[in-house]
Design a protein with these regions (language model features):
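Sequence/structural signature of beta-propeller domains
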Residues: 1-255
Length: 255
């Protein structure tokens, strides 16, 4: 792509040939939607008219959070804006699913994950089986349909969700019927992982990160992504980028 150039008029450094523009401002109205404050994690979704939808989380606390969508036509013009999730708290990051939904994660101690329709046509659905903890982000392994989740705590953990059933027609997992596991690095800071079944994903008495004594801590887990049979995730507390080779069960630090 090329080296980053000096900051443009918006303060954004981009490669040569790229340009930035502001498409929405917090507190302004667009097509009847009051664009939310504290925009955070987001993703884009292609539409059948060759345009796209940009989904953005709202990280306000105390049930003032949620998520909203901006819809663009094929020429990049904004043609609609609307809410897709309301009355949640500190929706930080999340994840784009292969089946075209947005998983919005609450970054609070009792946080949960909400599955949202980018088009705003369907009501958001609470996916309680993904656990209650200080959620940050989630990525889907498109080979196994397992979900990997990060936790934004200094002693946070890495989690994996496995569905008990995969739809025969779509090939997609049931997010209401499955189990959650937590990772243990067997020796040292890298290498093979062991996945322990989480006793109580709803954390009724004990936080999930403290339920399994062998679980390994990651210093403020952040963004996570699946690419070519590997899970990549970052940690803010020590500025690391991890890569988990799923097939070979090997965790490494690449930055």
């Amino acid at each position: 792509i090329g080296d980053l150039q000096v900051p443009d008029s918006n303060g954004v450094r981009l490669p040569k040939g790229f340009a930035s523009r502001i498409v929405a401002r917090s507190g302004h109205d667009y097509f009847g939607y009051h664009w939310h404050a504290a925009p955070d994690g987001g993703a884009t979704f292609a539409t059948d008219d060759d345009g796209w939808i940009y989904v953005s989380n709202n990280e306000l606390n105390k049930s003032n959070g949620g998520a909203g969508s901006l819809r663009f036509d094929k020429d990049g013009e904004l043609i609609d804006a609307y809410s897709i999730l309301k009355n949640t708290s500190r929706n930080c990051a999340g994840g784009h699913t292969p089946w075209g939904t947005w998983l919005s994660c609450e970054e609070i101690d009792e946080g949960q994950v909400w599955e949202c329709d980018p088009y705003g046509k369907k009501d958001p659905v609470l996916r309680a089986t993904l656990g209650r903890f200080n959620h940050e982000a989630v990525a889907v392994d498109t080979s196994t349909m397992q979900l990997y989740l990060t936790e934004d705590k200094r002693d946070g953990c890495l989690y994996r969700y496995t569905s008990n059933s995969i739809d025969e027609l779509s090939g997609y997992p049931d997010l209401d019927n499955g189990f959650l596991e937590v990772a243990e690095i067997i020796k040292g800071e890298i290498g093979a992982l062991h996945w322990h079944l989480l006793p109580d994903p709803q954390a009724k008495d004990t936080p999930t990160r403290k339920q399994v004594s062998q679980s390994s801590s990651f210093n403020r887990g952040e963004g996570i992504w699946f690419h070519e049979d590997a899970i990549f995730f970052t940690t803010t507390g020590n500025n690391r980028v991890y890569a988990y080779d799923i097939k070979n069960n090997d965790l490494s630090i690449i930055y």
